[in-house]
Amino acid sequence: GQPAWLVGHSLGGFLSLMCAARHPALGGHGIKGVLLLDSPVLGGWRARALELAKRTQLVGSISPGKISRKRRNAWPDAQAAFDHFAHKKAFARWEPQVLRDYIAHGTHDETIAQGTRRVLSFERDVETAIYNTLPHNLDRLLRRHPLQAPVAFIGGTESQEMKQVGMAMTHRLVGKNHPGRLLMVEGSHLFPMERPQETAAAIERALQSLAR
């Protein structure tokens, strides 16, 4: 094996960061760097506010879980599922082939008394539980377990998540002397699905910067 790059989008970025902090010698070979894709790191008063929302069970009213728990999960067929998502604001900007892949691998046919229908391949309750348990303690975790690998960040130019969370802690992690480690791609929080080719190119540039 070889040292690994950890690359994650949204929650995947947070998990990559947590893994790098807690397990710097991952697999016995170490971690070369962490690349966050629109995963602005929460710290300060915003982190404490999220912690309070989780403690008081109010997090479900402010997290994406308020949408996922009511997400439609069945359609007559795959084309109907595609058409449904294609007209949803969050999915309408996706590259069509990416959305087709989402339907192909994120849904499946289910046999029912009337024949077959297309259903989600994941449970809404699990998705909602994930949203409602977003980490609020990253700042404290990183103080206890300082990162031993460099960090880079790629964000969407129209990302609401970046605006809501702020970028102060992310800037501290990336550092001021590495402009190649803070990149932007046109699009929303879901820019990897909206502009996959541009995202792949940005990932390559960011990893090259981390390797220097």
For each predicted feature, which ranges?
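Active-site loop signature of alpha/beta-hydrolase-fold enzymes
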Residues: 42, 161, 190
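Short aromatic-enriched loop/helix-cap "lid" or pocket-rim segments at secondary-structure transitions
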Residues: 45-50, 165-167, 195-196
